[in-house]
């Protein structure tokens, strides 16, 4: 890959490898049609080192077989990476290496990681594998579930959902996997990623999932959401439909009380997901801290109050910065929705209605060597998953559910009444805190006494003129 990237941009090099993996691993009904380029034909063309047409042969195969992306504005578009001149020897070796590879998953994961880093601007990013595994384990998808990722990127959360269920039920899970992505390139990558792994999924044409409500409800929703997304709009607005005054009753069923701000999609995403959940559905999604912590009176605290009133919030987990994408320095929280938190057969043994679990995993990360990059890592992901499972009373097959108890500085279970007393804040660092040491407690008491004394002195200064006036009147 390093040698190839000397001849072409890193993103194009990775897309070329992905395309060749796709050609080599996905069977095609039309492969025996005369005149149609096939993987076997391409592999045979690499045997003659003097043949200078290998680049054209690769481009021909990719153009014919790569999945076209249906865009409502541009029509069907095949995004074929350009094979640069001077790379014939490397391309020939690459085709042969891919043909002989026994395990493609590690190469596929590395390509997706490199591609995410190369496109780490704005909302073009893919979910790291360790974070995807944490999100899926928190959602607990089951065989037969309908799973949606409305911002699917490379399809990593759909891949992980399939793996999670496959590991528990064996071959051929019957779940339905649906993804949608705004960017044509990412949409094509998602199709190839799933197809190379032999996973059946429906990747919808590119578009903004927020434009309209989801047409169907889903049992599981997973999303590594864009933070503070601007420039989103409902479909009637993008098509020049009539605008309504802010005071008008909302027509969109996703926002039953007040429409979200058009300049920031955070609240819109939360309500879009909540509206798309089936009656016993669960959702796990990443959201910027401010949606959990803002206390200034306004629509955000009111939204949190409604979510808690509906008993939809199951857990909020504070994560470190830069574990959800290579360029995302903003600290995020992982939100877990559950429309049925009751104890029941096939689920957990603890009735958690009217309760929320807060996990403070802000420092749970591994620093990658010689880099600013971080990752959760397997150990930290497992700690979070184990804590949530214990709180739910949820056990793996054949084992008893682990016990749960609050752990200062790590986790705390709170009632909705307690949360209401904190102005409906959902910030884990406000609840799962370390106990104060004796010195810290003493210092805090001194500071409180100083503030009270200053307030009393201010009151005395305000009263002094009135006292003097009263004395003169005697």
What spans do the regions from the language model cover?
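Amphipathic, well-packed alpha-helical segments that form the structural scaffold of globular domains
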Residues: 109-116, 136, 140, 162-163, ...
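Conserved S-adenosyl-L-methionine
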Residues: 121-223, 228-235, 287-290, 296, ...
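Non-catalytic accessory regions of SAM-dependent methyltransferases
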Residues: 1-37, 462-474
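Conserved phosphate/pyrophosphate-binding and hydrolysis machinery centered on Walker-type P-loop NTPases
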Residues: 101, 125-129, 263
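Short, solvent-exposed loop/helix junctions and linker helices
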Residues: 10, 84, 263-267
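A conserved structural/catalytic subdomain of Rossmann-like adenosyl-cofactor enzymes
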Residues: 215-474
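Long recognition/docking surfaces used for binding and targeting
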Residues: 15-120
């Amino acid at each position: 890959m390093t040698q190839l990237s000397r001849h072409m941009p890193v993103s194009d090099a990775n897309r070329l490898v992905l395309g060749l993996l796709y050609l080599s691993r996905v069977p095609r009904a039309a492969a025996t049609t005369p005149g149609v380029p096939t993987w076997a034909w391409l592999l045979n063309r690499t045997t003659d080192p003097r043949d200078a047409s290998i680049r054209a042969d690769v481009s021909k195969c990719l153009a014919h077989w790569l999945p076209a992306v249906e865009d409502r504005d541009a029509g069907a578009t095949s995004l074929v990476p350009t094979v640069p001149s001077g790379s014939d020897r490397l391309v020939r070796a690459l085709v042969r290496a891919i043909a002989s590879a026994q395990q493609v998953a590690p190469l596929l994961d590395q390509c997706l990681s490199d591609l995410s880093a190369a496109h780490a601007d704005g909302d073009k990013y893919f979910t790291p594998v360790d974070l995807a595994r944490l999100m899926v384990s928190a959602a607990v998808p089951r065989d037969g579930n309908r799973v949606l990722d409305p911002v699917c990127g490379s399809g990593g959360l759909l891949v992980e959902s399939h793996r999670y269920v496959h590991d528990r039920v064996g071959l051929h899970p019957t779940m339905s996997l649906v993804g949608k992505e705004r960017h044509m390139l990412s949409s094509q990558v998602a199709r190839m990623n799933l197809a190379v792994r032999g996973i059946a999924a429906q990747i919808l044409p590119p578009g903004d999932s927020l434009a309209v409500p989801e047409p169907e409800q889903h049992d599981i929703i997973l999303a590594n959401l864009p933070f503070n997304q601007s420039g989103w709009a409902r479909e009637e607005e993008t098509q020049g439909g009539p605008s309504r005054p802010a005071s008008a009753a909302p027509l969109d069923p996703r926002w039953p009380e007040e429409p979200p701000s058009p300049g920031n999609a955070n609240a819109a995403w939360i309500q879009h997901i909540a509206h798309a959940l089936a009656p016993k559905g669960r959702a796990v999604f990443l959201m910027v801290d401010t949606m959990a912590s803002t206390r200034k009176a306004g629509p955000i605290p009111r939204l949190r109050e409604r979510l808690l009133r509906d008993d939809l919030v199951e857990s909020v987990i504070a994560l470190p910065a830069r574990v959800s994408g290579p360029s995302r320095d903003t600290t995020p929280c992982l939100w877990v929705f559950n429309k049925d938190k009751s104890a029941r057969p096939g689920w957990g043994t603890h009735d958690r209605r009217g309760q929320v679990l807060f996990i403070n995993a802000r420092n749970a990360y591994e620093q990658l060597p010689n880099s600013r990059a971080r990752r959760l890592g397997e150990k930290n992901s497992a700690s979070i998953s184990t804590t949530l499972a214990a709180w739910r009373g949820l056990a793996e097959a054949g084992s008893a559910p682990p016990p749960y108890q609050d752990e200062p500085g790590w986790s705390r279970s709170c009632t909705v009444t307690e949360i209401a007393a904190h102005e409906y804040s959902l910030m884990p660092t406000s609840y799962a805190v370390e106990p104060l040491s004796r010195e810290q407690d003493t210092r805090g008491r001194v500071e409180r006494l100083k503030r009270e004394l200053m307030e009393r002195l201010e009151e005395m200064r305000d009263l002094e003129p009135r006292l003097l006036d009263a004395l003169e009147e005697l």
